Amino acid sequence: MSKVYDWFEERLEIQAIADDITSKYVPPHVNIFHCLGGITLTCFLVQVATGFAMTFYYRPTVTEAFASVQYIMTEVNFGWLIRSVHRWSASMMVLMMILHVFRVYLTGGFKKPRELTWVTGVVLAVLTASFGVTGYSLPRDQIGYWAVKIVTGVPEAIPIIGSPLVELLRGSASVGQSTLTRFYSLHTFVLPLLTAVFMLMHFPMIRKQGISGPL
């Protein structure tokens, strides 16, 4: 086993990387509120795991979506638990994200030289809200249907581009199969990919610049 480790160590300097990760200085003013971002990340990872598990059984069609969710809840082994954890962690992720944004703002974590960290964080907050909107429509129940109809109908009040924008969001003039397909694609592929990209930008900047000092 040591020979295998030595082989990787010689090429990748694993020990140096581990030492850098574990020996990072933590300022004395750091408290539990500085963990909110990490909790948000944990919730996201739970979302990815449970969401991936449900894609094996969920059917993104207007005729089968609701029935497939019911099947997950009643027939799939531990399906009720997986979906429940997905919903609970989604709510927790949004709450932790909001608290994290407030903590960073109130402690001045957005100021120079951390402007780009703040910008990527705001983008991640928007992506988190988008997860909520797109995910809400997937069960294709009454609450999800009317929520999506209202949310996608909001841009219609914008002069000139309002109606085309609504049609772009829905895929048609009304909420239907095209809307569900778009929201499913956004929820399971586009948004997770964008979130991963911005996290890979966000975390190295935090690592490089460190935690902002006390007020």
UniProtKB/Swiss-Prot annotation:
KW Chaperone (keyword) present: no
Chief location: plastid
GO MF annotations in UniProt: electron transporter, transferring electrons within cytochrome b6/f complex of photosystem II activity; metal ion binding; oxidoreductase activity
Entry note: cofactor: Binds 2 heme b groups non-covalently with two histidine residues as axial ligands. Binds one heme group covalently by a single cysteine link with no axial amino acid ligand. This heme was named heme ci.
PROSITE patterns per record: CYTB_NTER
Pfam family, any one: Cytochrome_B
Keywords associated with the record: Chloroplast, Electron transport, Heme, Iron, Membrane, Metal-binding, Photosynthesis, Plastid, Thylakoid, Transmembrane, Transmembrane helix, Transport
Necessary cofactors: heme b; heme c
Keyword Amino-acid biosynthesis: no
Annotated heme b 1 binding sites: 100, 202
Transmembrane parts of this sequence: 32-52, 90-110, 116-136, 186-206
Gene3D superfamilies: Cytochrome Bc1 Complex, Chain C (1.20.810.10)
Coiled-coil residue windows: none
Note: Heme 1 (or BH or b566) is high-potential and absorbs at about 566 nm, and heme 2 (or BL or b562) is low-potential and absorbs at about 562 nm.
Entry function: Component of the cytochrome b6-f complex, which mediates electron transfer between photosystem II (PSII) and photosystem I (PSI), cyclic electron flow around PSI, and state transitions.
The protein's name in its UniProt record: Cytochrome b6
Organism: Amborella trichopoda
